[in-house]
Structures are given as C-alpha cells and as structure tokens.
Amino acid sequence: MLRVESVFEEPIGHSPHRLHFLYHELRVGGSDYSYVFDKDEFDRHVKLFVQIRQAASRGVWPEVTFDDGHISNYECALPVLQARGLTARFFITVGWTGMKPGFMGWRELRALHESGQAIGAHGWSHSFLTHCAGEELNRELSGARMMLEDKLGTSITTMSLPGGRYNQRVIAACEKAGYTKIYTSIPRAERDPSGLMVGRLNIRAGMTLESIRGLLEPGSRALASLERQYRIKTAAKTLLGDRVYDKLWALLNRKEPDSGADGANAE
C-alpha cells in the first residue's frame, strides 16, 4: 500500500484556526440519507482543502476526519486522499471491525494505517458514552484503544465521541483511559492545537462546494450560525431525551435501515 507523503503540512510558525470536517460514508452518486456523501463531491472538497493549505495565508486550516469505519473509507476515501496528497483521521468503531457488513476489516484498517492515515477510536459498540458506566464504559474506551493498538501496532490517543454525547464523567473517563484528544460534533473552528476537546463540522449530503468555501472564510458567519443551531439541538436532546430525539433524527435524515451510521451519529 502506497504511503501518503503529504507536502501540505502546516507551515512552521503558522497557527491558524483549524476547522475539522466530519464525514461518514462515501458512495458514487450519493444517497438520500444525509450521512452518505457523494465520492466525486468529496474529491472536490479535498481539492479545495489542498488549495487552501497550499496558499498558507488563509486564517482557517481544514482537516478531514471520518467516523465509524465504513468500507467506503478504504475503497473511496483513501484513493482520493492519496491522489491529492492529503491525510485524514479515521475514528473506528472497534466492535464493528471485521464483524459488521459494510464496514472495514482489519486488513483494510491496517492498509489505511500503513498508507500514512491517522487512526483513532470511536468506542467499541457505538453506544452513547453518557449511557455507559463501569465495565461497559471501560470496554468502550480502554478496550477499544487496546484492541486498535494490538492490531495496528501503534499508539492510539484520540477518541471521537459516538453521537457527540458527553458529560464531565465521560471526559474524565476518556482521559483516564489514555486519550489526549477528544473529538466532538460541535461545529466550530479550533484555535488552540493543544486543547483537549476538538470541535468538528458534520458534512451532510447536498452541502455544496461553495458552502464549504464559505465556512472556511475567517470569521465565517455561516459557521457561527451552525454552532448556534447545534446549541439549540443540544437543548432539544436534553428536553426530549435520546430515544425520542433519535427517532426524529432518523426520520428527518432519511436513515437507511441497514446503514451503519445510526441515530447515535446525530451530532
């Protein structure tokens, strides 16, 4: 497997805001399900990100992440990233690896890692961590990390929160389990690269290249609006509870019955 040698690393002394984009599944032609994104449109996104990194004068530095470990991450995303010379971070639901149809096995995951892509954990079963305690929480955090480290032979220090759900108890458990970066679903640009919590912008089907370009403008009003919307939805989750909220989420997002991304992926 060809290893990516990116020539678009952040310039020394340049510390812009970072905007992390979150993708899930890619598919040729896309889908009505909002978490499935068109492969060709993803290529256009990556091309834009490379152009912005090459310019090295913009205030926002784009980063690419994927959640869940869908097979399209290997079959569709990796060739695009390699062709453009860009690396991404893939957060893996460990219990699905090699076990759930439509998701990567350890062979594909090793190939991702060996090509130079970064790997992080996304729990063991994709359970909301706020619903877990004791041994269950330990398996979702420490169990997932240790399995990835054993299978890939590398240190795993980043965690993506399933469904973006967390509280102070979960954050403390993540740190205790050895994670030094915790990725959320809060749509915001990050200024401090040393911070523990990292926000991300969830990419949905139908998001145009122009809308992405606008989000990367310094001081983007569109990004600020998305963060306000996120706060409103977070309040709705608290009011309705996860069960009711996720049923509404699945209906509004046209969730496919057999898709790996479930309501727990709602930001």
Segments predicted by a language model, with ranges:
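Extracellular/periplasmic catalytic domains that process cell-envelope and extracellular macromolecules
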Residues: I12-S15, A83, E190-D192
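Metal-dependent polysaccharide deacetylase catalytic core of the NodB/CE4 family, i.e.
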Residues: R18-V28, D32-Y33, V60-P62, H70, ...
